Regions:
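Active-site lumenal/periplasmic loops and adjacent helix-entry segments of GT-C-fold
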Residues: 5-141, 148, 176
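Membrane-interface helix-loop junctions at the exits of transmembrane helices
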Residues: 6-14, 35-43, 109-128, 220-239, ...
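Membrane-interface helix-loop-helix junctions at transmembrane boundaries of multi-pass membrane enzymes
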Residues: 108, 197-210, 278-302, 351-352
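Membrane-interface transmembrane helices that cradle and orient dolichyl/undecaprenyl
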Residues: 145-159
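Membrane-interface alpha helices of multi-pass inner-membrane proteins
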Residues: 148, 160-175, 213-219, 300
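Periplasmic/ER-lumenal interhelical loops and adjacent helix-loop junctions
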Residues: 206-210, 214-283, 393-407
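Active-site-proximal, structured, solvent-exposed surfaces of multi-pass membrane proteins
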Residues: 414-483
Length: 483
């Protein structure tokens, strides 16, 4: 399995000097560089145009931290990122095999499930086109959360602790993925109450176990949510851009065409997803209730990514936080891989035939992956947000153009955008360009002839920020200036 995951990784990242892609890769490179000094403080001034972005307060990083370790070792952002993606793919295929075996009860089916899940179109898009590495990590954790929730609710296993640990890992990975997973677990809980047929004893057990899991999750994730909420309580924080859900949802036809072409520049389920929607229809009559629910979940999670669902009805609800309905395809990856694994189990019986089928499936996945990569190389250069990450432009992308430059910035600071961009200092009422020196966890401005005047620095101020004048701590007044 590790070899298969390695071949999958090498196929897309063959050059350790250059990455040609799009999406959020510059943002995540800046995160790696910024996190390299996390033990000196949560703010790093060498990234995000030296503004002192508080991204680490609002964007969890625990599961992304191995990339930082690789950066410490290699001192190369590109190499550290490629190594991390390789590690992520290996961990994904191994974990999916482990939990697939727990759920499917057959080694061959678990093997197929882990391969399908790793190679799935939408997961590949998340990693190699969108460069949405946090969401890709979340796709590794979500099946674990769902398994323990299922085991606790339907198999009546005492899984409160592993459910809390896996949910905590998800929170430490990506908040929006956590939000969607909470909804999914909520639907499982609702189904559990329906199945229990209002039996009081079972309902009480379920409530107690879930309460334990929730309580432990809150405690385990306090390291992330406490500083974040303190920042929000102190001042207004600029949120990432909001979107119109109906507009961002996919056309059904575009989704199908993009999937059949396994086109990574579209946000679709890919060819494996198409097979997961069609192939199970030939086995549907032989499915048991659980298998039918999984198949219907695969279909529904795909439909929810399209304009088939009236997303405009949810625009003014908390659901709008997901920004893009096609993010729900992360669950289609899980349900689609599971139902195809059940199809494999039902269509394969003889031991010799199993080996042949598994070998053929793996070779086909590798061949399709190679063809997809070749097609992507031609299409990505035509994308509006295409960029080439190499040593020549790393500083420019991680410092000046990382993406999300003003995400999570204090709202009050946005009125000074022009002066921020020019790194101007206000002395009294006049703005001036002053020399400054940037270090990992601090920035030093040299300001002359300012005695008795208020100074406004082009730096974001968060709860916990310390300002010093000539080595002495000074009061920060109204979050904009230093006395």
């Amino acid at each position: 399995l590790a070899i298969i995951a390695g071949l999958y990784s090498i196929n897309y990242f063959r050059n350790v000097h250059t990455i040609s892609t799009s999406g959020d890769i510059a943002f995540h490179f800046a995160r790696v560089k910024g996190l390299s000094s996390i033990f000196s403080g949560p703010i790093n001034f060498t990234t995000f145009n030296h503004y002192g972005s508080g991204v680490n307060y609002f964007y969890p990083y625990l599961t992304f931290f191995p990339a930082v370790i690789f950066y410490w070792i290699s001192n190369n952002l590109i190499v550290s990122y490629i190594l991390y993606v390789w590690l992520l793919n290996v961990c994904t295929i191994m974990l999916m095999f482990h939990y697939g075996l727990k759920f499917l009860k057959r080694i061959d089916a678990a093997f197929i499930f882990s391969c399908l899940y790793t190679f799935y179109g939408y997961r590949t898009i998340d990693i190699y086109h969108r460069s949405a590495i946090a969401e890709a990590i979340a796709l590794t954790v979500i099946p674990i959360v769902m398994y323990y929730a299922y085991a606790l609710i339907y198999e009546k296993k005492p899984c409160a602790i592993p459910l809390a640990v896996s949910m905590s890992l998800l929170i430490y990975t990506h908040v929006l993925s956590t939000f969607m997973s909470v909804i999914a677990v909520g639907l499982l809980v609702l189904g559990g109450f329906v199945v229990s047929e209002t039996r009081k004893k079972e309902s009480i057990r379920l409530i107690v176990e879930l309460s334990k899991a929730v309580g432990m999750t809150i405690l385990l994730t306090a390291y992330f949510w406490y500083p974040m909420f303190r920042q929000i309580m102190v001042q207004s924080i600029n949120e990432p851009d909001k979107t119109t859900l109906q507009h961002q949802a996919l056309n059904v036809s575009d989704s199908l065409i993009g999937a059949m072409n396994n086109d990574l520049t579209t946000f679709t389920v890919g060819i494996i997803g198409i097979i997961s929607l069609i192939c199970p229809l030939f086995f549907f009559k032989g499915f048991n209730r659980k298998e039918k629910v999984i198949y219907l979940s695969a279909v529904v999670s795909w439909l929810l990514s399209t304009k088939f669902f009236p997303w405009s009805l949810l625009q003014n609800t908390p659901i709008q936080m997901i920004q893009f309905p096609w993010r729900i395809l992360g669950f289609q990856v899980l349900f689609g891989s599971l139902i195809l694994s059940f199809v494999f189990m039902k269509s394969t019986s003889a031991k010799q035939r199993k080996v042949v089928n598994i070998t053929a499936i793996v070779l086909l996945l590798l061949a399709v992956s190679a063809a997809t990569k070749a097609n992507y190389e031609h299409k990505v250069v035509t994308q509006r947000d295409h960029l080439v990450m190499n040593q020549e432009n790393l500083i420019r992308y991680t410092t000046l153009l990382p993406g999300g430059l003003y995400d999570y910035a204090p709202t009050e600071a946005l009125q000074y955008k022009e002066h921020l961009q020019n790194h101007e200092v206000r002395i009294g009422k006049e703005w001036h360009t002053m020399p400054y020196q940037v270090m990992d966890s601090k920035i030093v401005y040299t300001v002359h002839e300012s005695k008795g005047q208020k100074i406004t620095l082009p730096v974001f101020d968060y709860w916990g920020t310390v300002a010093k004048v000539n080595g002495q701590k000074r009061e920060i007044d109204n979050r904009t200036s230093v006395d």
